[in-house]
């Protein structure tokens, strides 16, 4: 891939970009290599829409991939900006947007560089299945916090660093059932909820909720659960601006 990435952001791994770029041909196939993501998408959308009125909202999708969540958010009336560092995936997302007629502002851009542009703040930011794939996830959380308007919400989904997660998300999904290619996930990069909570606090955000999310491959179905030992969703809110004093 182009060395232009070095001019954009250092907070990426080339191997991760190459890995997900290889999924382009079947990204929008609900029975293809991204089948689990298709099952998770309605759960993620419902989790967000219950906490943010999406119609007319400004929403940022960080690490948008081929645009599954981006389009779903836009269908709910949100004005969506979606960023990813993989040109191949942004191309897939744009082409599918042309086919579906759904308007999303797709960009090959790092969140640090979007922050440098000082855009209007966002009502909501989604960072789904992304933090476990970058060298410095805390920096992503911090950049997200700076891009939220007061009262705006950050939504994160990731994988807990537990034995259960290793057995199911790595051994089971990649080696036994083979839902995902081998090497998709690295156990050492999984994130415990307490670690995420610390990054959110450091960024000035208040953690509102943590909910488990479970994918059932035998049914190809996903659902929320009280158990956060494997996949989980989190919502954090930016503090309201202090009232002006006379």
UniProtKB/Swiss-Prot annotation:
EC number: 2.1.1.222, 2.1.1.64
Pathway(s) it belongs to: Cofactor biosynthesis; ubiquinone biosynthesis
Highest taxon of source: Bacteria
BP-aspect Gene Ontology terms: methylation
A Pfam short name: Methyltransf_23
Catalytic activity as recorded in UniProt: a 3-demethylubiquinol + S-adenosyl-L-methionine = a ubiquinol + S-adenosyl-L-homocysteine + H(+); a 3-(all-trans-polyprenyl)benzene-1,2-diol + S-adenosyl-L-methionine = a 2-methoxy-6-(all-trans-polyprenyl)phenol + S-adenosyl-L-homocysteine + H(+)
Enzyme class, first EC level, given as a word: transferase
Gene Ontology molecular function, alphabetical: 2-polyprenyl-6-hydroxyphenol methylase activity; 3-demethylubiquinol 3-O-methyltransferase activity; polyprenyldihydroxybenzoate methyltransferase activity
Function of the protein: O-methyltransferase that catalyzes the 2 O-methylation steps in the ubiquinone biosynthetic pathway.
PANTHER family given in the database record: METHYLTRANSFERASE (PTHR43464), UBIQUINONE BIOSYNTHESIS O-METHYLTRANSFERASE, MITOCHONDRIAL (PTHR43464:SF19)
Annotated family: Belongs to the methyltransferase superfamily. UbiG/COQ3 family.
Designated name of the protein: Ubiquinone biosynthesis O-methyltransferase
Species per Swiss-Prot/TrEMBL record: Xylella fastidiosa (strain 9a5c)
Gene: ubiG
